[in-house]
Amino acid sequence: MSRVKFLSKICFFAALLAIDILAFTPKSPAIIENSWDKANHFLAFFVLYILLYLGYEVKILKNLALLLAFGVQIELVQAFLPNRSFSLLDIVADMIGAAFGVIVVEILKRIYYGKSKASF
C-alpha cells in the first residue's frame, strides 16, 4: 500500500470521527455556529470525497452512495438530539460538496493522466 493511500485512509477516518463529534454534540461549538452552516457541510463532504478517492479509489457512485448514507445518518441522529434537528438542506449541501469533489478529482485525473484515466 502506498504512503498516500495509507495516510488518506487515516485522514478519512479521522475526518469521519471529527465530523461525528461536531454533529452529535447537543449544541454546535461557537466556532462553527454561524451563517456558514451549509458551507461547512459542503467543505466537509468535499474533503471526505477526496480522501475517500485517494484512500480507496472506489467507483464514483459507490463513493457518493457511502457519503450520502453518512450524511443521512448524521441528520437522523440529530433529529433526536436536543438543540439539533433533521435538515434536508444539510444533506443537499453534503452531496453538492461531494459532487464538487468528484469534479475536482476528474479534472486532476485528466490533467495528470490524460483522458484515458478519467471516469467521464
Mark where each language-model region is.
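Alpha-helical transmembrane segments of multi-pass membrane proteins
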Residues: 19-23, 49, 70-75, 98, ...
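Interfacial helix-loop-helix junctions of multi-pass membrane proteins
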Residues: 32-38, 76-96
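Short helix-capping/hinge motifs at transmembrane helix termini and TM-loop junctions
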Residues: 25-26, 56-57, 82-83, 109
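"…centered on the first transmembrane helix and the immediately adjacent amphipathic helix/loop
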Residues: 1-54, 67
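Cleavable Sec-type N-terminal signal peptides
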Residues: 10, 14, 18, 92-95, ...
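Membrane-interfacial alpha-helical segments at the cytosolic side of multi-pass membrane proteins
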Residues: 43-58, 98-109
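Membrane-embedded catalytic cores of phosphoryl/pyrophosphoryl-handling enzymes
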Residues: 55-56, 60-78
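Short, charged juxtamembrane terminal tails flanking transmembrane helices
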Residues: 113-120
